[in-house]
From Swiss-Prot:
Gene name linked to the record: CYP707A1
Protein name per UniProt: Abscisic acid 8'-hydroxylase 1
UniProt keyword terms in alphabetical order: Heme, Iron, Membrane, Metal-binding, Monooxygenase, NADP, Oxidoreductase, Stress response, Transmembrane, Transmembrane helix
UniProt KW Electron transport keyword: no
Ranges that cross the membrane: 5-24
Length: 467
């Protein structure tokens, strides 16, 4: 059988299974007294995945909400879904009734990250993992990382001087190196390039269809995933042989009295890299764009950072205390997180039939709280399309600003993310200027919304001035 015939057979089989599932679902839901939420399910199997990832997510989500209301159904990444777009609904799913909605991801991403990763669990195992991750990422732990993160930031900036760079790609390298530092300390130096090579192949298949055939993105990614696990096994073996203790994330995992298995450790390390890298790099790209487009804000941030620099001796490093003297910078980060809404939504799965606002959310269906819709609601944030850090001079109302999620599954590494962004902004604004190359108003859509072409910029060193 040639390859085209094989794919045709697989497609026909998938189509048959899709219609069979639809028939079973129709019979099951037909006996329920509650209706499904309004909405459309798109094409067989692929649903509305292409529409979601090929256009402005604001247009996709807001047009659905405008037509169907704050609760509607769709079909993306091979899954029937209910999308919710109000603070009250998000709280219902993520906090109040979180036990009815287990965390989940598309099948391809679950297999690549590993089934033992913290994202996919609830109950005692999740609580145990979260405690271990928080132990490594709490302020008392990451405050000691400031000099090393600063060194990574300075090395990155020096390598960008005088050249045109793709901001997103370079920030991915920066955040990847910070992620490795937080996970392995300085022990990963010998394996850094191999870890990077394997992970870069792995990430390309995160949103692919889970078809494990030679030549597919999924197949290539799973091969890289296997090699990544082998590298992590070598690192674990070396640490056990050395017998020394470490204050990094790997040390936290290995120091657990109940002992995680090597598979559990590997799955969660890969999961942390996934959570720490692309999202933070995306936010940093948007920060540079918004600062370049808002010179008054850039000037004010620069003044704030220069005031910190003036208190330093030549070559003196930043401290944890310095990073807490950046209120405007913090508001810039918050407003970027709101406007860009890197995390447009999160995935949950109903563990039983659930009623919400008179609609049935069937067991097994994915439920997606739409953070982007909430962050761009004019009822919550006035003039929501405008970049205005001053709006965060007053704390937002509960459940209206959720850039790191909400509830027990909120991102445990958010303090580290804000720290590495603050350190990078300090050195960018006090030592460098940058200009955007080409049009700056385009947006590139995919798993994350990015500035067009990753925001090409030219970075130049500022003349040295007396401080």
């Amino acid at each position: 059988m040639d390859i085209s015939a094989l794919f045709l057979t697989l497609f026909a089989g998938s189509l048959f299974l899709y219609f069979l599932r639809c028939l079973i679902s129709q019979r099951r839901f037909g006996s329920s007294k509650l209706p499904l939420p309004p909405g459309t399910m798109g094409w067989p199997y692929v649903g509305e995945t292409f529409q979601l990832y090929s256009q402005d997510p604001n247009v996709f989500f807001q047009s659905k909400q405008k037509r169907y209301g704050s609760v509607f159904k769709t079909h993306v990444l091979g899954c029937p879904c209910v999308m919710i777009s109000s603070p009250e609904a998000a709280k219902f799913v993520l906090v109040t009734k979180s036990h009815l909605f287990k965390p989940t991801f598309p099948a391809s991403k679950e297999r690549m990250l590993g089934k033992q990763a913290i994202f996919f669990h609830q109950g005692d195992y999740h609580a145990k993992l979260r405690k271990l991750v928080l132990r490594a990422f709490m302020p008392e732990s990451i405050r000691n990382m400031v000099p090393d993160i600063e060194s990574i930031a300075q090395d990155s900036l020096r390598s960008w001087e005088g050249t045109m760079i793709n901001t997103y790609q370079e920030m991915k390298t920066y955040t990847f190196n910070v992620a490795l530092l937080s996970i392995f300390g300085k022990d990963e130096v010998l394996y850094r390039e191999d870890l990077k090579r394997c992970y870069y192949i792995l990430e390309k298949g995160y949103n692919s269809m889970p078809v494990n055939l030679p030549g597919t993105l999924f197949h290539k990614s799973m091969k890289a995933r296997k090699e990544l696990s082998q590298i992590l096994a070598r690192i674990l073996s070396e640490r056990r042989q050395n017998g020394s203790s470490h204050n990094d994330l790997l040390g936290s995992f290995m120091g657990d009295k109940e002992e995680l298995t090597d598979e559990q450790i590997a799955d969660n390390i890969i999961g942390v890299i996934f959570a720490a890298r692309d999202t933070t790099a995306s936010v940093m790209s948007w920060i540079l764009k918004y600062l370049a487009e808002n010179p008054n804000v850039l000037e004010a941030v620069t003044e704030e950072q220069m005031a910190i620099r003036k208190d330093k001796e030549e070559g003196e490093s930043l401290t944890w205390g310095d990073t807490k003297k950046m209120p405007l910078t913090s508001r810039v980060i918050q407003e970027t997180l709101r406007v860009a809404s890197i995390l447009s939504f999160t995935f949950r799965e109903a563990v039983e039939d659930v009623e919400y606002e008179g609609y049935l959310i069937p067991k097994g269906w994915k439920v997606l709280p739409l953070f982007r819709n909430i962050h761009h609601s004019a009822d919550i944030f006035s003039n929501p399309g405008k970049f205005d850090p001053s709006r965060f001079e007053v704390a937002p109302k509960p459940n209206t600003f959720m850039p790191f999620g909400n509830g027990t599954h909120s991102c445990p590494g958010n303090e580290l993310a804000k720290l590495e962004m603050s350190i990078m902004i300090h050195h960018l604004t006090t030592k460098y200027s940058w200009s955007i190359v080409g049009a700056s108003d385009g947006i590139q859509y995919g798993p994350f919304a990015l500035p067009q072409n990753g925001l090409p910029i030219v970075l130049a060193r500022k003349p040295e001035i007396e401080v």
